[in-house]
């Protein structure tokens, strides 16, 4: 990306659902997008903001600066069909939201990230992460992105998964996986694999389970050991919450 119009075009293609996350080359987007004051009177260059605020006070108007950022909020430009967004400031332009998606107040969706729909989002979907249909991100749940920390593995979350409250993942999940509340799975996390009798079969790093389906990640309440066994109960979203968006 070498120009601001090209950057905005690609963000719109994503948010209009014409292309999915990670399908466009977004290299250079940060350099191409200027830092903007997003205000109640529209976007403004930062250099023009002090004069605009002073003029508003003189004229008895209130000029609200909702953010200072390179990315505007999604709903200033695009409102996808069939979605609910409880707090529009939590979803950036460039997010991909499939029909039936609900983003609650503490949910967050970055650009070049999103959901297939229907989905419940009460946690954070980082840049580059795509979540398949039927999956629930619990309150303050987290998915590892590639913008900081040196990681370059793009995370995908399969269908009918549950990342419980305050949990998170730095590996991709297949379908019907569950991570218990408060447990963050990083690629280097030591995981004990359990058989159907609850006996440890082997211990490995979580990255070796990357993308596999039907896994249940739990932490032993006495030893703190992270364990993984077959997930025998896939989650199901509350249809009433998503069919009438």
PLM regions and their residue ranges:
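Terminal amphipathic alpha-helical/low-complexity segments used for targeting or macromolecular assembly
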Residues: 1-76, 207-245
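Active-site-adjacent loop/helix segments that line or gate small-molecule/cofactor pockets in enzymes
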Residues: 68-91
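A structural motif detector for beta-strand N-caps
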Residues: 83, 89-91, 95-97, 101-103, ...
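Catalytic or ion-translocation cores adjacent to nucleophile or general acid/base/metal-coordination motifs
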Residues: 161, 183, 204, 211-213
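Short Gly/Pro-enriched loop/turn and capping motifs at secondary-structure junctions
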Residues: 168-170, 184-186, 191, 223-224
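Composition- and surface-driven signal marking solvent-exposed, interaction-prone regions
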Residues: 174-176, 191-192, 231-232
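A conserved acidic, glycine/proline-rich C-terminal tail/linker
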Residues: 188-208
